[in-house]
Amino acid sequence: MARPTKKSGPRKQKRNVPSGVAHIQSTFNNTIVSIADPAGEVISWASAGSSGFKGAKKGTPFAAQTAAEAAARRAIDQGMRQLEVMVSGPGSGRETAIRALQSAGLEITLIRDVTPIPHNGCRPPKRRRV
């Protein structure tokens, strides 16, 4: 029986994108960093989970720092130099992720908090009793 031929998908080509937008979504359980070009095409992304952290460790500031460094490294390989940062969510990794992007060698031009705030929308979850 003949072996099925392997189909190779579209190869990711190296683009030269000097500026872009970083979206940091920081929840209590995880931090996701996506870096896109000005048109909105995602160039690189990383999360605390994809950086090797599991369980409760994904919500830590160190995990957010590691994820931001990984995403920044891939974006710099594509030619990224300047970033606008959009931060969303209440998590503990917000500031750490921004600092990690800066220390990776990216110049941050703008930081904007885009956390959605309800005008008395859904009922919040019940208080934890430990």
From Swiss-Prot:
Provide ranges: composition bias, Basic residues: 1-15
| Cited InterPro entries | Ribosomal_uS11, Ribosomal_uS11_bac-type, Ribosomal_uS11_CS, Ribosomal_uS11_sf
Q: Name one GO cellular component term.
A: ribonucleoprotein complex
Which residues does the annotated region (Disordered) include? 1-21
PROSITE patterns recorded: RIBOSOMAL_S11
Q: Name one GO molecular function term.
A: rRNA binding
Query: What are the entry keywords?
Result: Ribonucleoprotein, Ribosomal protein, RNA-binding, rRNA-binding
Q: Which GO terms describe its biological process?
A: translation
Q: What family classification does the UniProt entry report for this protein?
A: Belongs to the universal ribosomal protein uS11 family.
What's this protein's function? Located on the platform of the 30S subunit, it bridges several disparate RNA helices of the 16S rRNA. Forms part of the Shine-Dalgarno cleft in the 70S ribosome.
- Summarize subunit and interaction data from the UniProt record for this chain: Part of the 30S ribosomal subunit. Interacts with proteins S7 and S18. Binds to IF-3.
PANTHER family with a match to the protein in the record: 40S RIBOSOMAL PROTEIN S14/30S RIBOSOMAL PROTEIN S11
Tell me what this protein is called.
Answer: Small ribosomal subunit protein uS11
The coding gene here is rpsK
